Amino acid sequence: MESLLQHLDRFSELLAVSSTTYVSTWDPATVRRALQWARYLRHIHRRFGRHGPIRTALERRLHNQWRQEGGFGRGPVPGLANFQALGHCDVLLSLRLLENRALGDAARYHLVQQLFPGPGVRDADEETLQESLARLARRRSAVHMLRFNGYRENPNLQEDSLMKTQAELLLERLQEVGKAEAERPARFLSSLWERLPQNNFLKVIAVALLQPPLSRRPQEELEPGIHKSPGEGSQVLVHWLLGNSEVFAAFCRALPAGLLTLVTSRHPALSPVYLGLLTDWGQRLHYDLQKGIWVGTESQDVPWEELHNRFQSLCQAPPPLKDKVLTALETCKAQDGDFEVPGLSIWTDLLLALRSGAFRKRQVLGLSAGLSSV
């Protein structure tokens, strides 16, 4: 066991070196040995994944014991922070070497040959290194896109090609991290929330919630112990939003009314919480007699126009969402005194404004139909 832990120590140092200028001294033989070392650890991952004591010992070493004072510094090598990462440590090593300009030409050529050996016999039970490398590159691309492409404005976010790409990458990543541990997707989303531009991340989540379910890859169908429902990626997003009240409040405040209506129609679990937020926002407003409008006490309060637009959008949704919204408004109106006169209850005024808007819309549609028949 101690020999295995020492082997892990040495590989962690090797992985740290792979991003430095020290690789300029590597020749093809060094690259080959490094990859063999990485593949051995991948074999360890596959062999001892269900062996509790060995897995625990390796996890403990990865977290605490495999960085020596006076070496490359304390803390885990990025990308190799847990036992699950051993399953693709050859991919991590290859990607670091490919990105390191200090690697010599001969060593780089040998690395590329190892990654893309050409046609030949393939182990049917193993994913090829180039496929794993491509998958990891997609993950990095997803984070890069989420971080640096948040400033495009498009009124129809759900149709924006860039947003849809980011959403699909996010769902795919959630599907991958969910295989290792049930709680990992939530932690992954929380880390993205802390690291990425938050407004853009919220938009990507909304678009992801409108995407069709991801199809499962053939090898996933054969893997024991993995039970994926078709919409699990979107369900993870829904549960994460509902479990983080501040994030969900920001989600509802930052996104356009029409997009939120689409999302809450698709995912009914979100609609009661969204309606609760709208109710809270409405209760913060008071009627200004001089201006003749409902206004907020503080600058962050939602203005009347926005509140009206959000309720109006929800009332244009198909049942049962539309019915729930109207019932909620009628309930609030009754609890507030059931007034019919404007200016006394914001719920009365909202219902009057919504009915007036619906009446005008019917008038316009009727006029258009009449003109078309002339």
Curated annotation (Swiss-Prot):
Record has Nucleus as a keyword: yes
Pfam families, alphabetized: FANCF
Keyword Nucleus carried by entry: yes
Major localisation: nucleus
Highest taxon listed in the record's lineage: Eukaryota
UniProt subcellular location: Nucleus
Database matches in Gene3D superfamilies: 1.25.40.490
Keywords: DNA damage, DNA repair, Fanconi anemia, Nucleus
Biological processes, Gene Ontology terms: DNA damage response; interstrand cross-link repair
Cellular component GO terms held in the UniProt record: chromatin; cytosol; Fanconi anaemia nuclear complex; nucleoplasm
Involvement in disease: Fanconi anemia complementation group F: A disorder affecting all bone marrow elements and resulting in anemia, leukopenia and thrombopenia. It is associated with cardiac, renal and limb malformations, dermal pigmentary changes, and a predisposition to the development of malignancies. At the cellular level it is associated with hypersensitivity to DNA-damaging agents, chromosomal instability (increased chromosome breakage) and defective DNA repair.
Quaternary structure, from the entry: Belongs to the multisubunit FA complex composed of FANCA, FANCB, FANCC, FANCE, FANCF, FANCG, FANCL/PHF9 and FANCM. The complex is not found in FA patients. In complex with FANCA, FANCG and FANCL, but not with FANCC, nor FANCE, interacts with HES1; this interaction may be essential for the stability and nuclear localization of FA core complex proteins.
Free-text function comment from the UniProt entry: DNA repair protein that may operate in a postreplication repair or a cell cycle checkpoint function. May be implicated in interstrand DNA cross-link repair and in the maintenance of normal chromosome stability.
Protein's name according to its UniProt entry: Fanconi anemia group F protein
